[in-house]
């Protein structure tokens, strides 16, 4: 289906636009559809994005942007002052604050921009000139919510797909890796992201090991385990506990990871950045949900599904869970339940429909 901007003529003229989003890699990746909508509505404008060092990697080589401005995560007063001077020199006419936290609100207010747009959160609402209700009558996908922020500009966008491009060189790197491990295009290739730094989003490692074996033994799948900075030892332990010898990917950057996921048939994982990268590459996904709300983090299309224990306390949106529950939402979610959810995704995985299990 072709997606279009419903209102191509923006209500506000702006030749210089700044978008602000801090925090995690996934937060910035899920903001890229906003850039697509802005570039469609403002094809000749100068568009910049203000973020932090780690998530800023998502925006490398993004063709929709003219500039990526990096704010150090723990900026000193001098660095804050230098950043503000740089922003004011750019003479932005429109600032869109997607995160709306105290730091971004102050920067937006002091940017010198005439038009300052954000979600309404009192008292920070006082720093902006245009506000959109923060709460929606029904739960909504995070990307849809951020696109809703553009409606005061007369922009109504419907394309929810995140953007993470990769080069031919990165594609060649992935192809060489797959050849080295004798993974052929005919095989069912499943990428699993088995880690999360927040305990209430982390399915037990032993469960992942058992799932890897089940995928190999019952479906004949080739399984690759994904990992990021500080996660290698944890993922190595998961691989060592599996009988089927899953392969760990190398220490790749985000764009090479995107090139890999573009070649995969299916993604399984926790609610973290690799999920959103998989979505950006158009492959079906299954997300193991603990404390978070699946509606907020999954696209509405049926090929992106969640599996959860469905306890009364879900979703609690908490980062920790002590007695008496002790993260029961993840502990009690069985490997068989998750495998059944994988099988339910067969309508969107062509190879899963025709491959016979191999033991």
Question: What are the language-model segments listed below?
Answer:
Residues 1-359:
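Catalytic machinery of carbohydrate-active enzymes
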């Amino acid at each position: 289906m072709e997606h279009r901007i419903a209102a191509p003529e923006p209500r506000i003229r702006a030749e210089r636009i700044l978008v602000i989003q801090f925090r995690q890699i996934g937060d910035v990746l899920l903001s890229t559809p906003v850039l697509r909508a802005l570039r469609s509505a403002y094809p000749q404008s100068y568009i910049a994005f203000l973020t932090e060092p780690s998530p800023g990697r998502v925006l490398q080589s993004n063709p929709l942007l003219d500039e990526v401005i990096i704010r150090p995560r723990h900026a000193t007063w001098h660095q804050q002052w230098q950043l503000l001077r740089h922003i004011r020199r750019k003479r932005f006419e429109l600032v869109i604050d997607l995160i709306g936290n105290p730091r971004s609100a102050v920067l937006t207010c002091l940017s010198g921009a005439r038009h300052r747009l954000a979600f309404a959160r009192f008292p920070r609402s006082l720093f902006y000139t245009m506000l959109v209700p923060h709460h929606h009558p029904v739960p909504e996908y995070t990307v849809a919510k951020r696109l809703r922020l553009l409606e005061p500009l007369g922009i109504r966008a419907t394309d929810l797909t995140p953007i993470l491009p990769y080069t031919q060189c990165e594609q060649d790197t992935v192809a060489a890796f797959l050849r080295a491990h004798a993974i052929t295009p005919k095989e069912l290739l499943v990428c699993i992201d088995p880690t999360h730094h927040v305990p209430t989003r982390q399915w037990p490692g032993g469960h992942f090991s058992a799932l890897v074996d089940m995928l190999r033994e019952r479906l004949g799948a080739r399984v690759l385990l994904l990992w990021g900075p500080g996660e290698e030892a944890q993922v190595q332990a998961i691989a060592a506990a599996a009988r089927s010898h899953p392969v760990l990917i190398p220490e790749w950057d985000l764009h090479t990871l995107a090139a890999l996921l573009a070649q995969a048939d299916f993604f399984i994982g926790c609610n973290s950045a690799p999920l959103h990268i998989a979505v950006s590459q158009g492959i079906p996904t299954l997300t193991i949900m603990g404390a978070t709300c699946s509606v907020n983090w999954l696209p509405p299309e049926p090929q992106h599904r969640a599996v959860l224990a469905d306890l009364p306390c879900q979703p609690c949106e908490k980062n920790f869970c002590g007695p008496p529950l002790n993260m029961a939402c993840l502990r009690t979610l069985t490997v068989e339940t998750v495998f059944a959810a994988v099988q339910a995704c067969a309508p969107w995985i062509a190879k899963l429909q025709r491959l016979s299990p191999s033991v």
